[in-house]
Amino acid sequence: MGRVRTKTVKKAARVIIEKYYTRLGNDFHTNKRVCEEIAIIPSKKLRNKIAGYVTHLMKRIQRGPVRGISIKLQEEERERRDNYVPEVSALDQEIIEVDPDTKEMLKLLDFGSLSNLQVTQPTVGMNFKTPRGAL
């Protein structure tokens, strides 16, 4: 079984990654040298633990965003995704089919004046079998 990492190791690794992300990689030995240069770490054992966790987090970051670590590149990508505007608006279609409930919601949101709305009756849900022994 693996060892439990202390909050000192985790916090130090997160701070190092946020500040020096561009200098770090997936190699433990280069991360160890970077940690040695940028931080005053009292012991060799602690330095190696921090460098190991930095390497672990760097591998996780490559797969996707990691909770608790804010990197400018990831922030910009998230901002770009949030501000996405489609080429053609969904409201520019010739006929938009909606059910009566959706029509009511659009009316409450002041979209009731859309001329291309066509109210259709909702389709009946799946025909589920009755549970065994219910008859």
From Swiss-Prot:
UniProt protein name: Small ribosomal subunit protein eS17
One Gene Ontology term of the molecular function aspect: structural constituent of ribosome
Family assignment from sequence similarity: Belongs to the eukaryotic ribosomal protein eS17 family.
UniProt xrefs under SUPFAM superfamilies: Rps17e-like (SSF116820)
Function field: Component of the small ribosomal subunit. The ribosome is a large ribonucleoprotein complex responsible for the synthesis of proteins in the cell. Part of the small subunit (SSU) processome, first precursor of the small eukaryotic ribosomal subunit. During the assembly of the SSU processome in the nucleolus, many ribosome biogenesis factors, an RNA chaperone and ribosomal proteins associate with the nascent pre-rRNA and work in concert to generate RNA folding, modifications, rearrangements and cleavage as well as targeted degradation of pre-ribosomal RNA by the RNA exosome.
GO biological process: ribosomal small subunit biogenesis; translation
Pfam families: Ribosomal_S17e
Source organism of the structure: Gallus gallus (Chicken)
Localization, UniProt: Cytoplasm; Nucleus, Nucleolus
PANTHER family registered for this protein in UniProt: 40S RIBOSOMAL PROTEIN S17
Predominant cellular place of this UniProt entry's protein: cytoplasm
NCBIfam families according to UniProt: PRK01151.1
Alphabetical UniProt keywords: Cytoplasm, Nucleus, Ribonucleoprotein, Ribosomal protein
Complex formation: Component of the small ribosomal subunit. Part of the small subunit (SSU) processome, composed of more than 70 proteins and the RNA chaperone small nucleolar RNA (snoRNA) U3.
Gene Ontology terms: cellular component: cytosolic ribosome; nucleolus; small-subunit processome
